Amino acid sequence: MKKLRTRYAPSPTGYLHIGGARTALFNYLLAKHYNGDFIIRIEDTDVKRNIADGEASQIENLKWLNIEANESPLKPNEKYGPYRQSQKLEKYLKIAHELIEKGYAYKAYDNSEELEEQKKHSEKLGVASFRYQRDFLKISEEEKQKRDASGAYSIRVICPKNTTYQWDDLVRGNIAVNSNDIGDWIIIKSDDYPTYNFAVVIDDIDMEISHILRGEEHITNTPKQMMIYDYLNAPKPLFGHLTIITNMEGKKLSKRDLSLKQFIHEYKEEGYNSQAIFNFLTLLGWTDEKARELMDHDEIIKSFLYTRLSKSPSKFDITKMQWFSKQYWKNTPNEELIKILNLNDYDNDWINLFLDLYKENIYSLNQLKNYLKIYKQANLNQEKDLDLNDAEKNVVKSFSSYIDYSNFSVNQIQEAINKTQEKLSIKGKNLFLPIRKATTFQEHGPELAKAIYLFGSEIIEKRMKKWK
């Protein structure tokens, strides 16, 4: 049995998007589950729209997500490469001309105005969907030769009549499309660049791709691609078309929707846990047989069955992704966090207490950095208008009177809180909020005694002076 090979083939016209990351992830999981190979190749023929760091964004951010390719432009295998379409232009052109020689394709000499005229004629006839008619263009043989000599033509593949293109979709089951709904279509544009549906087939054949998981927008591309496989007498891969990802209102994710971060680098920069996103994206259109949510990298690979891919759209719930990231960060050893954030200069006991206290409630490292900043800048921030009412001031004064700065510890601070509670017969928010505001200058936070202790006796004593 031949090795299972999957691929992710982005265009470097933009950065790695949530949808692209999920597509790459599912192809990666399918390959790894069956001990196959996962390939990244770059479809960079849309030169005008390519951006300088588009390719790097795709590969580097996938690597950050722990989605590493067996082969890519950075790890080429000569047997299957090149891994950028821009390096294969001559090959696409050569195969297109071979199809002409075999009678499967032809040169189409229409210019843009003539093609537009044919479309308008089709509309007048009431044709719902335009299909190119190869005998519509009426030009002289002399004009045809002139255009041929100057390369003013595209190459179209001949769409066979009354043919059904059928495949057993890995996600959706049986799908069939009648060729009469397609028409002849362009495989090489007038600038000698290949169209997507032509180049992608050549690439998949060259790289011996056996399974393809991709977005549902590619369903209409599949019969065109199957046509090329047939003309080249090449075995077809198995196709699977994933459902869309929507926002919480059920609308398809749009890159123009600025209310939601949609690019992986944005979550990386904010300090989300990469394995948490890997875990979260896996469940965005796939369910575990045992209904587990939190699974590590190897567990997910072992459990991944494509038969459990969803046929229904998946909602991108940012709150759920934050929950995943929170679970991963709070279970991350302190030593690892110290290394990631370069916190070696801090006192070991202090930084471990800080991390134990705050990592429980963060979903991003930026949050942790902001909490750390509160302590780092404490000396610069000794005064604050707290706007306490008389009852709250009384709580702070009582607490202040019980603190022993010569014996400053978490236990001693907790004892001062307890004595204040007993003296004033209060509890909950009425007890904790005034003390937290007066000592930490925050209204919310983790366990109060520990949060106060981390400031150190000197800073707390200065902040308590006004309450004596």
UniProtKB/Swiss-Prot annotation:
PROSITE patterns: AA_TRNA_LIGASE_I (PS00178). It comes from the Bacteria. A motif ('KMSKS' region) lies at residues 252-256. One of its GO terms (cellular component) is cytosol. It is found in: Cytoplasm. GO terms for biological process: glutamyl-tRNA aminoacylation. ATP binds at K255. It catalyses: tRNA(Glu) + L-glutamate + ATP = L-glutamyl-tRNA(Glu) + AMP + diphosphate. Signal peptide: none annotated. InterPro entries: aa-tRNA-synth_I_cd-bd (IPR045462), aa-tRNA-synth_I_codon-bd_sub2 (IPR020751), aa-tRNA-synth_I_CS (IPR001412), aa_tRNA-synth_I_cd-bd_sf (IPR008925), Glu-tRNA-ligase_bac/mito (IPR004527), Glu/Gln-tRNA-synth (IPR000924), Glu/Gln-tRNA-synth_Ib_cat-dom (IPR020058), GluQ/Sye (IPR049940). One of its GO terms (molecular function) is ATP binding. It is an enzyme of class 6 (ligase). A motif ('HIGH' region) lies at residues 10-20. SUPFAM superfamilies: An anticodon-binding domain of class I aminoacyl-tRNA synthetases, Nucleotidylyl transferase. Keywords: Aminoacyl-tRNA synthetase, ATP-binding, Cytoplasm, Ligase, Nucleotide-binding, Protein biosynthesis. Its EC number is 6.1.1.17. Belongs to the class-I aminoacyl-tRNA synthetase family. Glutamate--tRNA ligase type 1 subfamily. Monomer. Catalyzes the attachment of glutamate to tRNA(Glu) in a two-step reaction: glutamate is first activated by ATP to form Glu-AMP and then transferred to the acceptor end of tRNA(Glu). HAMAP family: Glu_tRNA_synth_type1 (MF_00022). This is Glutamate--tRNA ligase. It comes from Mycoplasmopsis pulmonis (strain UAB CTIP). The gene is gltX.
